[in-house]
Regions:
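Acidic/His- and Gly-rich active-site-bordering loop/insert found
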Residues: 8, 12-109, 114, 118-134
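Histidine/acidic-residue-rich, glycine-tolerant segments that coordinate divalent metal ions
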Residues: 90, 97-108, 115, 132-238
Length: 238
């Protein structure tokens, strides 16, 4: 048991497996129904903070819509772990018949952050209930603006990304059976980067195309050439 960064009584470790599923379900459905884009998660942040206050959990605001909370156990053994969830949604119109589908036109929790936030709230609720049964401190990060890639910066600027022993973050996967946790020694997910290419042409009379530069044709060729790059730059095994 001493290998755990938080030290629980043995029966409480088992009890931690039984979080309030109904609370988690209701929270997830509320968040799914009220999605907000990166940096605009005001209602989401208010919902999270209201629940933390109900549970008696101390927290501080991070930026306008991020939230950082902490739960101290019965004894401060100097050990800290960080649990993190993202909270923002995507600019996608939801086309489902769910009873709790998005009420915000053009915005949807299509990446599962509603589940992440609800799960962390459920964990926070349970940890608050067994607070007297563990030693150490649990830190909770409800991170805004993950989709735009700058949400963590607010936590960094406030010095909240140091001083803990381990950090845990999860992401749901619809192709993984319910109740299964997947761990990987290597990267298990990916993100995308954006870049812009500008092709500048030069006009010419149709009778003298050789005096011009056809940006459209160059663009068509470029698309095909870019598609070849991975096979030429990366090993086949990757």
């Amino acid at each position: 048991m001493q290998n755990l960064f938080l030290v629980f009584a043995r029966n409480e470790v088992t009890d931690m497996q039984h979080c309030d599923k109904e609370f988690a379900r209701e929270s997830r459905r509320y968040l799914h129904q009220h999605p907000e884009l990166s940096g605009q998660e005001y209602n989401t942040a208010n919902f999270i903070r209201e629940k933390l206050r109900e549970f008696g959990i101390a927290y501080q605001n991070v930026g306008e819509t991020g939230t950082f909370a902490w739960i101290k156990g019965r004894q401060d053994n100097g050990r800290k772990i960080l649990l993190r969830a993202d909270i923002d949604a995507l600019p996608i119109a939801e086309q489902t018949n769910l009873s709790y589908k998005s009420v915000n036109p053009g915005v949807m929790h299509a990446c599962g952050h509603d589940i992440h936030a609800a799960a962390l709230l459920a964990a926070a609720k349970k940890l608050a209930e067994v607070q007297a049964s563990f030693s150490g401190t649990v830190l909770l990060a409800f991170q805004q603006a993950e989709e735009f890639g700058h949400g963590a910066q607010y936590f960094q600027e406030q010095g909240l990304l140091t001083g803990y022993d381990r950090a845990f973050g999860v992401h749901i996967a619809p192709d993984v059976p319910v109740g299964t946790i997947v761990l990987s020694r290597k990267a298990d997910a990916a993100s995308c980067d954006f870049f812009r290419i500008t092709l500048t042409g030069r006009k010419a009379h149709t009778s003298k195309p050789h005096l011009g530069r056809d940006a459209l044709q160059a663009g068509a060729v470029l698309v095909g050439e870019i598609a070849k790059l991975p096979s030429r730059l990366l090993p086949a095994s990757e």
